Amino acid sequence: MPSTSKCNRISRVADEEEEEEIVAVSSDADESESESEVGSGAEEEDDDYVGESSDSAGGSGSGSGDGDGDEEGGRSDIGDGEGEGGGRRVRSACRGVRANDRERKSQNVDALVRGNLVVRRQPLIPRILSVSDAAAIARKPFKPPCQNGYSENNEQLARRLSARKRFVPWGSVQPFAVTNILPQSPAVSSDDSVENEESLPPGIEPLILWQPEGRDKENSNFSAIKVDHLLVRYLRPHQREGVQFMFDCVSGLLNDDGISGCILADDMGLGKTLQSITLLYTLLCQGFDAKPMVKRAVVVTPTSLVSNWESEIIKWLKGRVQLLALCESTRADVLSGIESFLKPLSRLQVLIVSYETFRMHSSKFERPGSCDLLICDEAHRLKNDQTLTNKALAALPCKRRILLSGTPMQNDLEEFFSMVNFTNPGVLGDATYFRRYYEAPIICGREPTASAEEKNLGSERSAELSAKVNLFILRRTNALLSNHLPPKIVEVVCCKLTALQTALYNHFIHSKNVKRLISEGTKQSKVLAYITALKKLCNHPKLIYDTIKSNNSGGSGFDDCLRFFPPELFSGRSGSWTGGGGMWVELSGKMHVLARLLGHLRLKTDDRIVLVSNYTQTLDLFAQLCRERRYPYIRLDGATSINKRQKLVNQFNDPSRDEFVFLLSSKAGGCGLNLVGGNRLILFDPDWNPANDKQAAARVWRDGQKKRVYIYRFLSTGTIEEKVYQRQMSKEGLQKVIQQEQADGKMQGSSLSTEDLRDLFTFHEQIRSEIHENLKCNRCNKDGCMVLDGSKFDSAATEHEASNSGENSYIDIGGFGAISGCVQKMNSSNQQIGSPSEEDLGSWGHHSDPSTVPDTILQCSSGDEVSFVFTNQIDGKLVPVESMARAATHRTHEVTVNAEKEVGKINSSNVPGTERQSLLGKNLKMMGFNLKNSSMKFPTKSRRMLPNCLQGMNKTSTSSDHQQTKKLHVISDASDDDFV
């Protein structure tokens, strides 16, 4: 039988265990019952227990005669009648307490299962300890062992450790979502905002998106909307303009009622992600009525960019928003994450999800309030309004839509209409009206055979369309990057086919299948298969050999072609086809030029290069070349997992690692990757869609790039590749419809008419460049030289004679001509006209002689395979280190030229051979050029860059050093500052 002393001991233990406890009751219980239950069950439980036991003890004590009510008295006289009555009261009280506990536990379990649990804080000892009002938490937050508390470095560790504690309530399979696991960032006070304003760097003004005026200014409910200074300090002028533009569109400030979304169509590298994050954070925190305009936002992006978006938001906002990124998650995790995001009381503000994941779970977002702002990255994925992804996103009940795309115009105006209609439904009418009123007249007016009336009508409709869409489409070209990034040169390199490629190409285009295709016409899939086969042949005959061996239908035009291949060339022992010392490289013109270019880069520079192709089989050839020549390389294609891709990018960008080549599939990694560790990029084969090539080419000329950038586009001369590139220029011309860049109201005609598409299966073997022939260039003759007659040449010659020198008249944009030593060799046809756009090849520099190309590496690598080169130099801003190196290089070049002249004078004189060496040394020393101890220090690798006449003059060098000097010698008049 329990005694009062035992009850007292129980009460003391309960008092010493904790100072507070959390009492949970069901929200649907009656209020009076809840208060009574909490009061009797939590606050008064131990007190009533102790009180009754004390009374019984006191009673028994008085019966013994001492009346003290102490514990000893209760023990000695507990056996009498009155003591037995007290014991019964104690047992009854204990049973009542246990019954209350069981009932309260049952109610709490039911509340947990139903999801209507209410958490309250109650004091354990109300007479001694009182609990002030505070936020209810279900457990204590994780406390890191370090004294400095949370930081960016250990926050992820805290999340991982805290995530292990999961409570699954009885009768449920879903874990109980516990809030406030991590301490939230404190709200920014007014004092902090003042400090932020003061912390803005000099010259940077606050960015105010909207401020009340007139009656709104007098209304206290309206407050100004301005961007947090945490982000303002990093925004460039064009990015501030972009944030303001997007805010005006999505906030409804435009007068047009049909506009609630926008398309940010800036070129790659202009910071579309940062601009959208800035607007996202502003709308999550502010609004016209001092309340957030957006409560939930969804960011939809390609799968490969989900983790990149998560890292960018964390980087710029530093944990100020609650976000959830669903990347490579299981189906159960995706469902759980979406449900957590869509809960009415969820603290999550941003959901980052891939296009495929959203399409599969789009039905869950149909409820009202599921999304207040939609951001679609790489929005050219929405170019077809008949896809399931487009339909799923279009059904989302969200009017505020922001589309991010560096290439809004990809193939035709119909695809452009799909993106516009998704952003602002109905703003251009339905598809039938748009096709009849806009698309047909514009396309007809762009044809070379269009009449004057058709051209005028096309110009009018184009101007009308531009006026409408420019209200909610903002596009800036990457010319703005010249103020922030190093100079860039784009080179279109035309490479001849080898004898084997020529024989295979002629056999294919004259085959029965191709003739039947041209005369009768077949399915489009058959045409694309033949085009793909020819493009693979231009890359390397090995790809055709594999096609024939595998009996693939794509090689039907290459029947009986095995006789063209050397015996057992690709069928060596153990399946090896690398015999002959790597002679397989020379079977392709483009591959041969690439192999030489990689060799010169590896030996003479510390540059890194990105090789891009549309075919994984071509990437296999690149990898084989790198293995044979022991070049370190990294490969990223469709088979690379999402988590591994960012690691490969970081590995390539790490300057401490010995990386050289990055093999990239344009389909798998052409979007969003930042490969600033490399400053050279080769597009080995063209794509029908210019957007894919532009996306891939923008991987290296981005924020963070410190070196000069070289972009190479390899094309096989006279083949289908040149025709594909001309088609790209035609599509790029269409993009000006949304930019209003037609000067003097005149439309620029298509570079390729519809009839020209039938000329795909022809081969112009004897010309230097089919593109140059079609341009009908009046700056060059058939040999690529300056036209020798005409009034234009006479006036140009007069101006040339009036100038001081040819070098002074040449505007060397970016300094590429000076560092490559080709300035004195250039004529007017080799020089570009102004700063042309990337599709205006007529104004680029035209080079039939590779020695006039402002690129030292390409000069050395061209060989006999390069037939023609187009160059476009884009100005930029060099970092101070490279600027100093460039100045030192120019000084070195000047001294070297003077030294060569002095050597020539002495060699042509009658000075005896025994005295020439000493005389030459004295003269060079007077000029400041001393081979042994010169005041002009050459770079570490400058030994190979000395002129031919000075090679080997330093007698202290060993024979091995002399051999290596001859091996690494560069045929150039000046060294490239990238060599330093």
UniProtKB/Swiss-Prot annotation:
GO cellular component: nucleus
PROSITE patterns for the chain: HELICASE_ATP_BIND_1, HELICASE_CTER
Annotated positions binding ATP: 266-273
Span list, region Disordered: 1-106, 828-848, 950-980
Gene Ontology MF, one: DNA binding
Polar residues: bias regions: 951-962
Residue intervals of the Helicase C-terminal domain: 593-758
Keyword DNA repair applies: yes
Feature: compositional bias, Acidic residues: 15-50
Residue ranges annotated as motif DEAH box: 377-380
UniProt main location, coarse: nucleus
Alphabetical list of SMART domains matching this protein: DEXDc, HELICc
EC number: 3.6.4.-
Compartments (UniProt record): Nucleus
Keyword list, A-Z: ATP-binding, Cell cycle, Cell division, DNA damage, DNA repair, DNA-binding, Helicase, Hydrolase, Mitosis, Nucleotide-binding, Nucleus
Task of the protein: Involved in DNA repair and mitotic recombination.
Classification via PANTHER family: DNA EXCISION REPAIR PROTEIN ERCC-6-RELATED, SNF2/RAD54 FAMILY MEMBER
Family: Belongs to the SNF2/RAD54 helicase family.
Name by which UniProt lists this protein: DNA repair and recombination protein RAD54
UniProt organism field: Oryza sativa subsp. japonica (Rice)
